């Protein structure tokens, strides 16, 4: 089918100024771009007053775990509605691919956060198998990183020990196979099991492998806060110690380092922002291709036990209630929150379990006040009510000023780091992340519009070596997002819907028009994105 989109304000993904022009789409690809294109087309769409760019490209996603569902649209619909057509998945070391099919630890892939649970189309140990599944049944385009946590789990489970030489070779072979099959890079999750057990020598092996194939290594650092459980409590801020570890890992290489979701967890961490970027800049000066990515929410999603140390979780219910353990837990918990710069008003219940929906959306402080008890006691009760498996939204992880400052840097990409939860309150980034970046740009609070668009289109495709994506030019695939700048600039933020996204095309198929999804087209509109 031939479609002519006329008179649109075109952002071509290069960072150049927008221009008024026409785009001719033939089948899956862009055939021509120019002004006054005179040609016969099956459909002519007048974009007068509207803007158009390549479909938005989420630079940091975990939607590989949801792309394998039998009905993936349920999980991807909110992203499509905010103009996203493509994803870089497999982040934080937690990829859905990268394990030996006969591994006794295969079910541990995902570190307990994700997994092949529920109604999936199958289990896909390799990148090749995952890509074949995406091409059969997916609404969106999916690139994937191979996760170190997944590969390490495959050969050694979650054991806290150095790998044997044989295990090391098997792990690296898994990662290399993924790169050879078109993975767009590798990923580390140094805060997750079993990535947290890897030393610098092990992560350096992974970095050198990514460098060999000229692909990025994305890194969830060991700490993103001023204090954590991973380093001695006093001295240099832990977020900076974690970055020091990456400096040591990359020393002497020319690797592509992608520092994931540059956040500053807790008010006590905000002061580290300049030093973090000074270190990244120093790495660049020493030959490391260092970049980072951000989302624009002030909160993050965490397990409800985020402030409960392992020793307390391992106690029996009876021992948890012993006065000495209660006192020790309370003192250490309050101290850690104070050192981080969190308060009980900052922790919102997102999900506890069936029949406990009345607590969703309330803060621990609110619930404690309703119950007439201390916040720490109420928090412990909430943990127990959820079986220590609840979920919270908490912050601050940043400020509007920090986000605006980071969003203007040349070495940043934009992303959501969000996924659809089965129950409870959702992360607002699934609804309104990329439109918010545009809204901030239009209001003078972010980068310029051409650069904003580049950081969510062509810049992402370039970084991860995805050919023929991210740009509006002849020969590129016709992933297109049409948006109304006037509506976006004046919109009142709504956490459950984006504003101003008028049309979305994925590989030449119009899948969203004025808020209505074409669910039939979306069954097979997406493609696997192989890196080259």
Across the structure, where does each feature detected by a protein language model lie?
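Histidine-rich, glycine-flanked metal-binding segment
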Residues: 1-4, 10-55, 73, 490
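Acidic, glycine-enriched loop/beta-strand segments at the rims
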Residues: 11-22, 390-397, 402-403, 448-453, ...
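Active-site mouth loops of central-metabolism enzymes
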Residues: 59-70, 156-169, 195-197, 232-237
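Divalent-metal coordination cores built from histidine and acidic residues
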Residues: 69-185, 214-215, 288
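Active-site neighborhoods of metal-dependent hydrolases
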Residues: 134, 139-165, 173-192, 233-236, ...
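Divalent metal-binding pocket/active-site signature
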Residues: 183-242
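C-terminal cap of metal-dependent C-N hydrolases
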Residues: 317-326, 330, 334, 404-411, ...
